[in-house]
Every structure is written in structure tokens, then in C-alpha cells.
Amino acid sequence: MHRRALLTALAAMALAPAWAFHALPEKFDPQRDAAADVQQALALAQAQRKMVFVDVGGEWCAWCHIFDRFVAARPAVQKALQDHYILVKVNYSPQNRNEAVLSQWPKARGYPHFYLLDAAGKVVASQPSGELESGRDYDEAKLLAFLRRHLAAQ
């Protein structure tokens, strides 16, 4: 019985998407090495023929949490991100502004701010999140259009 459980677990791991196993941050963490996280995301993007979705913000940012909840509740958005992007969170807070990484890209005009990078690290899009909002939430159609519009750079 133990052998069967082990084989089942191994089969499940083999079939699961690769994004499920990398150690990129799920939260904004001022202690993380943002440069290393972005490099890891780029390596994964190259290996998987995807782009990188960089989410810049902080645990202090209400709209950052709204975005996380929005994505978690929208299967179409989750699918678009999982199919075409490696997601990486880069902290911006008084504890760590990650200036070395963020100075390489267009200046953010608020948070969260989204950058799309091709697998070589070139900025394909720099998007203030406010343009993707609708009322007190995000607009699914606007977000999906943003994600799809830049896939040609892949």
C-alpha cells in the first residue's frame, strides 16, 4: 500500500504545473532578495517559454491584497497567469525599497505596479494597477486584455 501511495504522489507531482514547485515569494517580503527572485523567475520563464509578471507592492498596500483576492477568485485570470507567466512579487516598503532592481525599470506611479518582462528580462509593459481597477475591485476584462495584449513578446 505504501508503494502505491508513493507512486500516486510521484505521478501527481509529475503532472502538476512547474509553477507549483518553485520557491518564489507568495507575499511581499522585505527580507527577500528581489534580484535573485527576478533572476529565478526569468530562468523559469526561459525554460517554460513564458513571460514574467512582476507584482511590486507591499504588505502595507490594501490594493495589493485586493489584487491577490481578486486573482484567487477568478479562474480565467488564474489560468491566463499560469499558462503564460511566472509570477514574482517584489517588495516596496520603508524596510526595503528594492531600489537596485526597481531602478532598472520605468518608475512606478503607485502600488501595486505591474511589469511584464520577456524571458530575456526586457520590460514589455509597465502598468499602474489603477487603470485595471473598477470601483473597489479590479476589472477582469481589463486585466485579461492587459495580460493577452503583450503575449506576442513571448
Labelled PLM ranges:
Residues H65-A80:
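Typically the conserved alpha-helix immediately C-terminal to a functionally engaged Cys/Sec
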Residues R49-E59:
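Short active-site neighborhood of thiol/selenol oxidoreductases, capturing the structured segment around
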Residues V77-R97:
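Thiol-based oxidoreductase modules, predominantly thioredoxin-like and allied folds used
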Residues W105-Y115:
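Structural micro-motif
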Residues D33-K50:
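A short beta-strand-turn-helix
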Residues C61-H65, F114:
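The canonical Cys-X-X-Cys-His
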Residues R3-L7:
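N-terminal export leaders
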Residues H113-A153:
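Non-catalytic, surface beta->alpha helical segment in thiol-disulfide oxidoreductase systems
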